Amino acid sequence: MIAQWYRWRNDAMMASMNVADRSHARVIRIQQAIREQPGLDGWLFYDFRHLDPIAYRVLLLDPSLHVTRRWYYWVPAQGTPVKLQHRIEPHVLDGLPGDARAYVSWRDQQAALGSLLHSAKRIAMQYSPMNAIPYLSRVDAGTIDLVRSLGAEVVTSADLVQQFEAVWDDAQLASHQVAAEGLRAIVDEAFGFVGTSLAARSSLT
């Protein structure tokens, strides 16, 4: 019963906030986290055929999305995020807030990315220096080379990722509190039963 209540309450809380609202709130949190990192201009998310599951979880994207082309999502410390997607798949990031741009060819992509990051000097990506954290190392070396060739310094997103992967959100905390209250009630009831049974000298089994 407690487990069912736990699941019901969590589902109800999440359902009360639509996808767009959740995505908008998440991006606000991401920008707050970026601003807490000294000298960081933004966080660049990148994926090709689901190579980066971290990006999908942090951005609250549907993991079942059909993705066959590269996409980028630039979240600056300040200002409006930007989506860069292939023209064949222009709706992959529809659930995320921000301006949308499209590319067709490799040259288009490179030029669009350069325009996107023209003022950014220090960028976080799912990259781990010396592959120290394999779990985090999701962006291929070629893409790192591409971003660096545009004049930006690429740094690890480890400190940012842990704020979303290793910390409860409000809904998870609320669900935990409901479960804790239920367990406390069960413990109190069990000890009450034991006390009553001992006082009456009746069997507990």
Feature locations, PLM:
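N-terminal accessory/capping or targeting/presequence segment of soluble
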Residues: 2-115, 181, 185
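Flexible, acidic/His-enriched mid-domain "rim/lid" segments that flank
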Residues: 2-11, 27, 108-205
